[in-house]
Amino acid sequence: MKIDLHIHSRNGSDGHWGLEEIFAEGAGRRQIDLISITDHDSIRAQGLALELAQSYGIAYLTGVELNVTFSHPAYKGGNPVSLDCLGYQYDIDNPVLVEKLEALRNYRKRRVVRILENLNREFAKEGLPAFTVADLDAIEASVDGALGRPHIAKYMVNKGIVATQQEAFDRYLVQCDVPKMPLSLKEASELIRGAGGKLILAHPNDPNGTSLANLTPSLKEQLQIVHDAMMDYIDGIECWHSRHDHKTTGAYITFAQNMGLMVSGGSDCHQHPVLMGEVDVPDYVGEQFLKGLQSHVQGATR
């Protein structure tokens, strides 16, 4: 069984491909058997994803990636950092979840407006033309789901302001950032579990992402943080990830097994480059999800 439970789409967040392209590639050349679309703070693409999974004969888990704020008194002076969690197998029509994600979506638009205002101040210093309402509309039109800085970065490349999206972040978007709408780990857990799903700590040692590596590079200390401060709120850990090395994967698998947690894995593919199905996730990961929750699964194994 080939499994990828961490994929982003253009329909819902910052992926480069739409759902049709993802499923055509996944069912065709990649031969993926179990998949989940995990867009940032958005479940708008889930209905179509379920339909496409059934059409292509791929087993599917409803998914979402939630950005949460987390703090620990022993690190960063107790100041909060951003972490990511993955929600799986929730009811896409749960009214509380839908309402909260709509609030997050609306906040993201207001955040983008404020980021553009900050960018305009930097542009003025450099003699560059300011972003206008038309630019905001164009950025917003580029995505159906959750707006964010990657969409601004892509637009800046298209406008010729920077050569690459990474340059957009390095020169402008880091210093012009505006905080995301705070969502605590406890709130995220209540949202996903309240909708019948499971909450998984995403890529806990990702050196380039929103992970526990922002608190400490020590795997031993990370595991202690999970043990002491997260066990009440998570159902599992994403052990296999495209930016996890073998040591990280092994440490988190052992911890999860000892603590009775689920394990998950995926590429975190944004299709740039295309990594779908390239993380070797063992069959038992899929089996633990499929075993008791068939109501959320469409399609069949090959």
Residue ranges and their predicted role:
Residues 278-302:
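Mid-to-C-terminal alpha-helical segments outside catalytic/metal-binding sites
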Residues 54-220, 224:
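Extended substrate/RNA-proximal surfaces in nucleic-acid metabolism proteins
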Residues 1-82, 178, 183-184, 190-192, ...:
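An N-terminally biased module of ancient metal coordination in phosphate/nucleic-acid-related enzymes
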